Amino acid sequence: MKKMTTALFLGLTAMVFTWTSCDKSEDLSQKKEKEEQHVISKHADILLQAEQMTNYDKWVYIDLESGKQETKTDYREWVYGMMNRQTGEMQQITKTIPERANNEPKKWHIAFHLYDPMTNGGEVMIAGKDTTSLDQITELPKGGTWTPDKPVWILVDMAGMMQMPPTMGYSKGFSNPNLHKYMRRAGMGQYEMANKGRIFIVIFKDGSFAAIKFTDITDATGKKKQVSFDYKFVRKK
């Protein structure tokens, strides 16, 4: 009987030790995972056009980790002619300007043109309608459709708009269709906020990601075009 009692005691002790070890291992694993994530929350105001009919050839790049912004002239090949909006093809091409040296900043995550946003090799999805706060995003969603940037014609030169036929310059650029949904066209050269309150999630090549909530597309006066948003950036160490 004594031997059985001793054996039972040792068995229970081993089980408790195992459970405790598992709990500690899980705690350490969760702690390690949290330590591997570096979370930054910021607000960004990106001025895109201070005066009408300007800055069509500019991109504003932002490093979401530091918040640093840099404005650069579009360096890709420009094609002059008429764009068929139904087919997305250029017609009546009059001239081209070859691609110039890449002038993108060494570090950037997303960039904004007056009418188009793009990512640095990232993919974008829009969180469900029940997700309305950045605080709700603590990890990447398990499902959903991620959309990469797509080739598009970017309007960069409006100088020939009044010619007959109109001949404007377009860059062979890229834009992200999902990220573009923060605004919608409201008329010739006019846009308005769309998907208000929705959270846009961008995942980058290194595994880091950002949750973005757009707040405005003009400045406080309503005269200058800018994109404003709150965001949470999660960097993998």
Regions of interest found by a model, annotated:
Residues M1-F9:
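Bacterial N-terminal signal peptides that target proteins for export
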Residues F17-S21:
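C-terminal motif of bacterial Sec signal peptides marking the signal peptidase cleavage site
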Residues S25-K237:
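Surface-exposed, beta-sheet-biased, low-hydrophobicity segments with strongly acidic/polar composition
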Residues F9-V16:
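Bacterial N-terminal signal peptides
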